[in-house]
């Protein structure tokens, strides 16, 4: 436990854990030994229930299964041993299918927990490494930066303005200031200011800490058992499926009760009617619906992870299909976040000059004293550091690591042949950059004198300046005319899409010397333009939010294909809004603005909150991207919060619903497509299950009402249930995303799953199935007596209908011939397995006795195939008619329009 280290000094802590406060652990053998002793740095989940126990519980959890058991027992009492064995076998099969479904659902959900491994920065043998947090051991030296999640209990050994949010552990909302000073022992958790606790979040500053407890030995580990006992809430879709299941169950039970009563009054065998009634209840009630929904959602999430979009919460999958506004950061999401200085301006120049593309700039190329002063300020006001190339996780060839702007500036300094000045200038203090401040400043010591350096947005830097230096480094008073000249050059550079960074230095922080401007290029990501236009075609607005100047933002938005007019004045007036302008708007004006504005410039994370709230008040379903600590509230407020996997802080990732592992906007399009596709698949298998349920109930009901003998026996009905709830239904949930899915507008937030159109399709399919099946039954029963052959033909007819109906339900709008009949591998296996099972039921002697069937000829099979394929052909005609009438928007039409 970490409590003993409160009173230890830094030196005592290092001595006790045999580590070094600067170099960390140095022996790989010792790290391995400590890992064996203390185990991985994760929280162990309690042992799960034995699979055998889980399986046996299936027999008692469903009242209908218990009723079937009772029916089997009554059959034994009456001497009908064959019937009793048949029913018992059917129970085992039904329960096994249900168990496999639930087990698969649990395993799929479990796999989701492993999608987001957590990493941390650790110093070992004096070198910084980026490792999986679970591999930390006591004694490791961990680097903490703003936005990090603390990976273990740490004794702080170095802190610079370090503040940590401990609300998830202590309940206190205000971040706690941390220091390295030893404190008295036996104090409360909230007063332990030299310990950073596992799972808490760095809100401000930076520091280092030595691991003093890992895994279950941490303070967070002590409360983990309580967290384990909390059951995860179901998603809205799962709840609606539960409600739908209950409603259908009630309707089915009423219908079944009527069927059984009619049978009794007609003088049919009461035990047979009871068994058929219970079997119908098992078949008609879609108890597998919520499970298949869960499996479909979970497998869809796993599929998204392969496309670099990690969904952290299942309900988000449902929301993705409803998103109609995406608010995206510019840097790193719409652009590459690989920044390069391409232009430099210093006072006295007529215009900024462009840097050549060569790696090293010749000394003769404009190497003035003014540029050297600007480069010195940019390099000193900089937190980039040399990157450990052995670190494979960061996946970069750049020799520097840090914020992209810092890296661009230090690389520019290197290109001019300047050595890193931070080795000779000793930093005294730092004011970190934030999106609210829009600047960073440092105080340094050099030759016993103190100097201040500043970099940031031009307006912030200029407001702190009283002087400027010319190209020769000579200092002059900053006049209004020179300010205007600086701002004109900033505007011209920004108009070409460059991010502008101003630099200054001086002794007095309120009277700094302005040195110049750096124009930094951050090119758009590949495929972003196509993604933006594709989303807009599908009814999704794309809004760009950036801290850049409005001129830079407009230029970038236009290059990305957003709906921005070519005239800059009109674009700025009607399609762009700055953070300052946004603050001046009342709620009504803000709602009007967000309904038309495409670009928000010079914004802060607080502005993001206002934008989300205004859009939601208009009824929009909003996705918002973010990567910083202060973005977290907006990410939580948005319907879909999207964090960056590479550049994003742990705080942002904790608040987000989705994480982009490649930070690319194009990945959002893939996720929205997948979300819509998953919802389509859910509608398709609901259509399949409902049409089969309605057909089975209607078949028995019509037979009872018209006094026919039962066309299906209890065992056959249970077999149909296995097919309806089993592999064919599940295989519909993994159908590939339809390429036309983005042509459909976003789904309204509260739109019911069972629409009028879906219900019409269900009733049409059920009508065809029931009509043809009754015709087959009546044709076979010409002598008035029901034989094994009659029920076999009827039973096989219904099963074939199931298979063709499943094939038709693979897509609501697209022909199966365009999809490719064999394009869904799981569907092929499911249908193939079902047909093999049906062949065994009809032709294998042991199963013939159980299901009361007999072999039928090839001619019979061909006739049945011809009859049952009607459900597919009718659905194909329906799809063709909708396409012919232009009721279906397709991607091919979109591409033709844009040729």
UniProtKB/Swiss-Prot annotation:
Gene Ontology MF, one: ATP binding
> GO annotations under biological process?
calcium ion transmembrane transport; intracellular calcium ion homeostasis; manganese ion transmembrane transport; manganese ion transport; release of sequestered calcium ion into cytosol by Golgi
Residues where Phosphoserine occurs? 892
The top EC class, named as a word, is: translocase
Localization, per the record, is:
Endoplasmic reticulum membrane
Keyword set includes Translocase: yes
Give the reactions, separated by semicolons, that this protein catalyses. Answer: Ca(2+)(in) + ATP + H2O = Ca(2+)(out) + ADP + phosphate + H(+)
Return the EC number: 7.2.2.10
Q: What gene name does this entry carry? A: pmr1
This protein's name: Calcium-transporting ATPase 1
Give the taxonomic lineage as stored in the record.
Answer: Eukaryota, Fungi, Dikarya, Ascomycota, Taphrinomycotina
Q: What is its main location?
A: endoplasmic reticulum
């Amino acid at each position: 436990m970490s409590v003993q280290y409160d009173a230890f000094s830094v030196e005592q802590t290092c001595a006790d854990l045999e580590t070094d406060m600067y170099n960390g652990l140095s022996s790989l053998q010792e790290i391995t030994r400590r890992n064996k002793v203390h185990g991985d740095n994760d929280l162990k989940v309690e042992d799960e229930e034995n699979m055998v126990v889980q399986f046996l519980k299936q027999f008692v959890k469903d009242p209908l299964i218990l009723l079937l058991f009772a029916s089997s027992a009554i059959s034994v009492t009456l001497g009908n041993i064959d019937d009793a064995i048949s029913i018992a076998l059917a129970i085992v099969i039904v329960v096994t299918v249900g168990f496999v479904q639930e087990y698969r659902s649990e395993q799929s959900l479990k796999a989701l927990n492993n999608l987001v491994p957590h990493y941390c920065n650790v110093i070992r043998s004096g070198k910084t490494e980026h490792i999986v947090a679970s591999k930390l051991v006591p004694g490791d030296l961990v680097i903490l930066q703003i936005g990090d999640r603390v990976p273990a209990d740490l004794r702080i050994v170095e802190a610079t303005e370090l503040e940590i949010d401990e609300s998830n552990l202590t309940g206190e909302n205000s971040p706690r200031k941390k220091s390295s000073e030893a404190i008295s022992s036996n104090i409360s958790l909230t007063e332990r200011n030299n310990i950073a606790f596992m799972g808490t979040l760095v809100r401000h500053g930076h520091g280092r800490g030595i691991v003093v407890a890992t895994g279950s030995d941490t303070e967070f580990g002590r409360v983990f058992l309580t967290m384990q006992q909390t059951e995860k809430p179901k998603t809205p879709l799962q709840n609606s499926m539960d409600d739908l299941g209950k409603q259908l169950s009630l309707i089915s039970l009423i219908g079944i009760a009527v069927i059984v009563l009619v049978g009794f009054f007609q003088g049919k065998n009461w035990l047979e009617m009871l068994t058929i009634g219970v079997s119908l209840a098992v078949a008609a009630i879609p108890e597998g619906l919520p499970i298949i929904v869960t499996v479909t959602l979970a497998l869809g999430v796993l599929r998204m992870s392969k496309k670099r979009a990690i969904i952290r919460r299942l309900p988000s999958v449902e929301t993705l299909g409803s998103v109609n506004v995406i608010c995206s950061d510019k840097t790193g999401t719409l652009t590459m976040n690989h920044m390069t200085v391409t232009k430099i301006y210093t006072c006295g120049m007529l215009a900024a000059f462009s840097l050549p593309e060569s790696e090293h700039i010749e000394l003769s190329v404009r190497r003035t004293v003014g540029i050297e002063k600007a480069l010195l300020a940019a390099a000193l006001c900089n937190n980039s550091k040399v990157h450990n190339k052995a670190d494979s996780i960061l996946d970069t060839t750049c020799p520097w690591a840090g914020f992209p702007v810092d890296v661009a500036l230090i690389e520019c300094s290197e290109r001019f042949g300047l050595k890193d000045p931070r080795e000779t200038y000793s930093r005294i203090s730092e004011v970190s950059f934030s999106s609210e401040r829009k600047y960073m400043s440092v105080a340094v010591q050099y030759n016993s004198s103190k100097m201040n350096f500043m970099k940031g947005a031009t307006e912030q830097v200029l407001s702190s300046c009283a002087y400027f230096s010319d190209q020769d480094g000579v200092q002059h008073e900053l006049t209004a005319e020179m300010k205007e000249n600086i701002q004109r050059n900033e505007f011209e550079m920004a108009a070409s899409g460059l991010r502008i960074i101003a630099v200054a230095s001086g002794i007095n922080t309120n009277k700094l010397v302005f040195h110049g401007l750096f124009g930094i290029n951050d090119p758009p990501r590949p495929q972003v333009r196509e993604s933006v236009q594709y989303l807009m075609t599908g009814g999704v607005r794309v809004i760009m939010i950036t801290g850049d100047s409005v001129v830079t933002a407009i230029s970038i938005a236009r290059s990305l294909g957003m709906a921005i007019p070519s005239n800059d004045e009109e674009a700025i007036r009607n399609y762009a809004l700055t953070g300052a302008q946004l603050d001046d708007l009342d709620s009504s004006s803000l709602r009007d603005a967000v309904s038309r504005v495409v670009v928000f410039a010079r914004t802060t994370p607080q502005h993001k909150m206002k934008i989300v709230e205004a859009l939601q008040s208009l009824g929009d379903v909003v996705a918002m991207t973010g990567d910083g600590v202060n973005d977290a509230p907006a990410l939580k407020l948005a319907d879909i919060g999207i964090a960056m996997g590479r550049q994003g802080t742990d705080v942002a990732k904790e608040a987000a619903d989705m994480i982009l592992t490649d930070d690319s906007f194009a990945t959002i399009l893939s996720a929205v497509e997948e979300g819509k596709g998953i919802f389509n698949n859910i509608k398709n298998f609901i259509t399949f299950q409902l049409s089969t349920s309605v057909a089975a109930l209607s078949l028995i009901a019509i037979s009872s009402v018209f006094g026919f003998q039962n066309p299906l026996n209890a065992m056959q009905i249970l077999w149909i249930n296995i097919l309806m709830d089993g592999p064919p239904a599940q295989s519909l949930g993994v159908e590939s995303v339809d390429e036309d899915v983005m042509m459909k507008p976003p789904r309204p937030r509260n739109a019911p799953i069972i629409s009028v159109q879906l219900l019409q399709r269900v009733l049409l399919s059920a009508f065809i199935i029931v009509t043809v099946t009754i015709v087959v039954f009546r044709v076979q029963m010409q002598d008035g007596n029901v034989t094994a052959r009659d029920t076999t033909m009827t039973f096989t007819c219904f099963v074939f209908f199931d298979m063709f109906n499943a094939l038709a339900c693979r897509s609501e709008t697209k022909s199966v011939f365009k999809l490719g009949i064999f394009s869904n591998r799981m569907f092929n296996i499911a249908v193939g397995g079902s047909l093999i099972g049906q062949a065994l039921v009809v032709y294998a002697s042991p199963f013939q006795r159980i299901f009361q069937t007999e072999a039928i000829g090839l001619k019979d099979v061909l006739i049945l195939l011809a009859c049952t394929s009607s459900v597919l052909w009718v659905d194909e005609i329906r799809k063709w008619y909708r396409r012919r009438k232009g009721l279906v928007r397709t991607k091919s039409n979109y591409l033709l329009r844009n040729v």
